[in-house]
Amino acid sequence: MNSETLAPTPPATLVIASRESRLAMWQAEHVRCALHKLYPSCDVKILGMTTRGDQILDRTLSKVGGKGLFVKELENALADGRADLAVHSLKDVPMELPEGFVLSTIMEREDPRDAFVSNQYDSLAALPAGSVVGTSSLRREAMLRARYPELVVKPLRGNLDTRLGKLDRGDYAAIILAAAGLKRLGLGERIRSLLDPADSLPAAGQGALGIEIRAGRDDLAAWLAPLHHEHTAAAVEAERMVSRTLGGSCEVPLAAYATWHDGALHLRGIVATPDGERVLSAQASAPAATTDAALELGREVASQLEAQGALDIVRALSTASGPAASA
């Protein structure tokens, strides 16, 4: 959080739009508390909403319309004035926002890694051949199939509590979840091991919260500015540029993860086929002192992946899933 910027006094009331899942409400409450600490006289309210993505639980995101299913209703609330800002898990935000909306604020990142959760086993390597592993993302599925072809990977939908419930009743030997969500809800003890990014590269923006507002709300952007975390923002801007450049979506196993070391931003990107048979990898580093530098780093990694044939994978998967994705 950047506390050096003194924002102007906000209005008497601000309304946060949020999904109604326990994790989403925790995130909205986290932002509400941060704003209340900055502006004690401001009454910050939360407008809970059920999105289409929360309602469709019998199919994977890649088959029902992708990440936009989690944000459309929240954007409608911004557009019609019911809410001033919307809080998102950044990995769930489409790479291209609809006209009239902007991501004004990116907050400091939680642990971006994937977590191995099981009631019987300590790690993926400990799972017997044929064990069923649940995951909600094609990215994780592709990496699991590439490194552990002896395991059976099956879809896993629902909110965090629902997914843990399916594990506890024996539907899966293990499940893979974002570590950040578990830690935010005080469920860190459910994590048996954290997956090394070398084995399971995080999704672009994983672990970070983004705040979306209507374009042109410069006053609101100024009030939110103290919550913006520059290092996290540079990292996730680079990551999202990889996906944006390649046309990534929920139909494509694509990952991008950036870290800071000695003043330089190091970015790695991956594009794979869902069966894990092809995994393309690229990486680059740059000082990335500005947003433009971070975006250029993302383009560089995307260009390396393009040279290896990434666009062939993206086009093939997008064509194959086109009709389903519009359902």
From Swiss-Prot:
Cofactor(s) this protein cannot do without: dipyrromethane
Keywords: Porphyrin biosynthesis, Transferase
Protein's GO biological process: protoporphyrinogen IX biosynthetic process
Pathway: Porphyrin-containing compound metabolism; protoporphyrin-IX biosynthesis; coproporphyrinogen-III from 5-aminolevulinate: step 2/4
CDD domains reported for this sequence: PBP2_EcHMBS_like (cd13646)
PANTHER family: PORPHOBILINOGEN DEAMINASE
This protein's name: Porphobilinogen deaminase
